[in-house]
Amino acid sequence: MHILIANDDGYLAPGLAALHRALSPLGRVTVVAPEQNHSGASNSLTLQRPLSVFEATDGAQKGFRFVNGTPTDCVHIALTGMIEEKPDLVVSGINQGQNMGEDVLYSGTVAAAIEGYLFGIPSIAFSQADKGWAHLDAAERVAREVVERYLSDPLDGPVLLNVNIPNLPYAELAGWRATRLGKRHQSQPVIRQANPRGEPIFWVGAAGDAKDASEGTDFHAVAHGFVSLTPLQLDLTDTAQLRTVRRWQTP
């Protein structure tokens, strides 16, 4: 069993070290992660400059490879330029903060898993709700249990799984729930400030609150203490709208 691990918080993030600890007993583990935090990078690739790969030599990150690029760069380089045999599983995380609803379109954590999925490799993204790494030990334990369950009871077909873990002590977790993506309200407006020269600068505002957090969604599950397991797919075609768009077809 060979597992490729990546993340978007950077190779020094506690969540990456936790995921490495969780999965190392299950087989050979290769870590390739960004040098810097790339939260919100989505599926971006670095095409304007060459990329470099470095290796950490001490601490909890000893042996980790890190790249001066995005999460997708990391998985792409690992699969096409570093690893001779395709790994059995790509796992991303553990992210600091949830990736639910429309978050999956922006998330570098989910994007790293998507890149593995595009190469035909079962892929799982792990995120811990809320910031600050509280109860990371619980998220670490859940990550190992989910991967162990996948290995003992594989899912059918191509696998792209988005897992969100409540920020709770392990004993307080309510269990696991299979969920669909919820929906958010619009994000908050940008925050306008000025630089020392008086010129305007802008900070992207916070994500919107949950709009659809009904039962069955990832938002609902996590809010009620459950680990949310959401299978994803990449076909964004609106099949219902396709029928009406055909009216625009030329002869």
Swiss-Prot record:
GO MF assignments: 3'-nucleotidase activity; 5'-nucleotidase activity; exopolyphosphatase activity; metal ion binding; nucleotide binding
UniProt remark on cofactor binding: Binds 1 divalent metal cation per subunit.
Location relative to the cell: Cytoplasm
Reaction catalysis annotation: a ribonucleoside 5'-phosphate + H2O = a ribonucleoside + phosphate
Cofactor(s) needed: a divalent metal cation
Assigned protein family: Belongs to the SurE nucleotidase family.
Protein name according to UniProt: 5'-nucleotidase SurE
Organism: Ralstonia pickettii (strain 12J)
Taxonomic classification: Bacteria, Pseudomonadati, Pseudomonadota, Betaproteobacteria, Burkholderiales
